[in-house]
């Protein structure tokens, strides 16, 4: 990379700083690599092949058990090797642009990732939901989304790109950093977290994006997250939520083996076509068939069906009856989600009395149908509310500019 020095001193400093950052960002991250990929990368960097298996074991422990983000902290690796690793690779965390804490203890982070050689930095949101005895991290798989589900705030942000396995895992690693969930890390004062054990006990792929439109990177990240020699999360505590990418549902069961959740939200094709437009490609009959055939499906490994409660849209008792009929014979749990409002939406949340009637009918038919307690609404961290802050700012700036132009024309 060439640098022009026909600049002021301040400009030169800025350009040199950008050059240094670009060099740093160009280095591949060891986070998110499979063991096979890490072996190839280490050999290419000059690690003797006879040492590779041992070095991978050391690195895996430091990255995923100890949670270090600086090669200098890897104390059982020689100084020369640490220097070589730092020259060729990075294990740095993303920038935490913002952390918001809800009155109910929910935390939302805005993470910024470097461009990695092209384009501009990207931002995504992750949410931590503490409950008694457990803590759930909601992770994003894409920057934006392609699905345009009409009730979902994320769907109003166009897809920018898929996240890499590194960026998916970095959300978990950084959240564990912030919560003191690695050895020798302190929990923030006043943080609402489980009283004993891990701070993050569960992860759900329910953040920004459709995970199954980024299958390979999501697969790699979740297999690392569930690896017994590292982060060691049980696959029964990892849930992948999809709007219904039918071909990849089969692959999810065969190749990843985590718990499955379906963003259902309607029991008639004509309504689901509007609420969840992917239904036009994979209608309900195909989706439900894939669910019935999901590998490992049992009463101990039920599918969760998510159903947002929209006033006078999908919340009638007739809808409840059709829901029970549609899912007949599938080991399932039905999460009823009170609609979380966001600026500009035309939908309203169902009345609480109607939600309870709906739940009572489904429960009486033999399906657990908990009503999800809204969490983090005051920081737009609740289900369906995620959208990167940078996108909101750009939109607000455009609106402000348009208002100024209108005002100018009116003079």
Curated annotation (Swiss-Prot):
Its recorded reaction(s) are: adenosine(2503) in 23S rRNA + 2 reduced [2Fe-2S]-[ferredoxin] + 2 S-adenosyl-L-methionine = 2-methyladenosine(2503) in 23S rRNA + 5'-deoxyadenosine + L-methionine + 2 oxidized [2Fe-2S]-[ferredoxin] + S-adenosyl-L-homocysteine; adenosine(37) in tRNA + 2 reduced [2Fe-2S]-[ferredoxin] + 2 S-adenosyl-L-methionine = 2-methyladenosine(37) in tRNA + 5'-deoxyadenosine + L-methionine + 2 oxidized [2Fe-2S]-[ferredoxin] + S-adenosyl-L-homocysteine
Key words, A-Z: 4Fe-4S, Cytoplasm, Disulfide bond, Iron, Iron-sulfur, Metal-binding, Methyltransferase, rRNA processing, S-adenosyl-L-methionine, Transferase, tRNA processing
Q: What NCBIfam families does the annotation carry? A: rRNA_mod_RlmN
**Entry's InterPro entries?**
Aldolase_TIM, Methyltransferase_A, RlmN_N, RNA_MTrfase_RlmN, rRNA_lsu_MTrfase_RlmN/Cfr, rSAM
Any Gene Ontology biological process: tRNA methylation
Give every Radical SAM core domain span.
131-380
Kindly provide the name given to this protein in its UniProt entry: Dual-specificity RNA methyltransferase RlmN
Q: Which cofactor does it need?
A: [4Fe-4S] cluster
Q: Where is the active site?
A: 125 (proton acceptor), 383 (s-methylcysteine intermediate)
Residues binding S-adenosyl-L-methionine, per UniProt = 209-210, 241, 263-265, 340
Return one GO MF term. Answer: 4 iron, 4 sulfur cluster binding
Q: Using the UniProt record, name the top-level EC class of this enzyme in a single word.
A: transferase
The entry's function note states: Specifically methylates position 2 of adenine 2503 in 23S rRNA and position 2 of adenine 37 in tRNAs. m2A2503 modification seems to play a crucial role in the proofreading step occurring at the peptidyl transferase center and thus would serve to optimize ribosomal fidelity.
Keyword hit for Methyltransferase? yes
Family matches, as CDD domains: Radical_SAM
Question: What species was this sequence derived from?
Answer: Brucella abortus (strain 2308)
